Amino acid sequence: YKWIDKKFSDEIKFTNINPDFIGINSDIKFPEKNHRNNFKKINNSFNWKSLDFKFVKDLENPKKNQLFYNPITDFNAYDGLILGFRLHNKTFKNKPSSVNIIPLYSSLEKKLIGTIQGIYNFHNEESSNFLTQISLRTQTYHYAPNLRYSTYKPTLNFVFRPDDFRSDIRKLLSFSWLSVNRDRSSSVQTDPNYGIGIIE
């Protein structure tokens, strides 16, 4: 741990210090909007951070990629008792991207079911369309004995706000497509699959 005092320069050169990582404002003593990019791992070409698993949602640690897990129990008529967990990276502060993975086990069908969702946010503070969001959600369960259904829902959201930043008014324009794929039942002759376009 070494404090380097260098004034009036945009470039700092390090020699023979062999660091594990380089941090700027590492103790967060100075307020800033985004401190996620304040740490650079050395000898890591992808700048991957180590994973930190937490049971309860916590304050963000900019040195690590945090994943939170929670146990889940549920029940429905075709899957019976459902057991599993939720794994996600959402913290109290909004992130550019988030994942939500929910692997579950159907006690009645003895098979894996669950949900996966990924969201990516594009922020533009200079525009009334200050947030554009792309997401993909897929899930699979059973709708009859030994018959599975799966849904896929890509979504594109445009979020608008007025020029007055003190206003809490928000407007949303949303485009999504819901695709439903079902295992074919011998008792039903029609195609069980369908898709729906949604504009909100």
Question: For each predicted feature, which ranges?
Answer:
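Short, well-ordered strand-loop elements centered on a beta-strand within folded domains, enriched
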Residues: 1, 21-23, 99, 130-136
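Outer-membrane beta-barrel initiation region
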Residues: 12-14, 25-128, 146, 153, ...
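Generic surface-pattern signal
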Residues: 123, 139-141, 161, 178
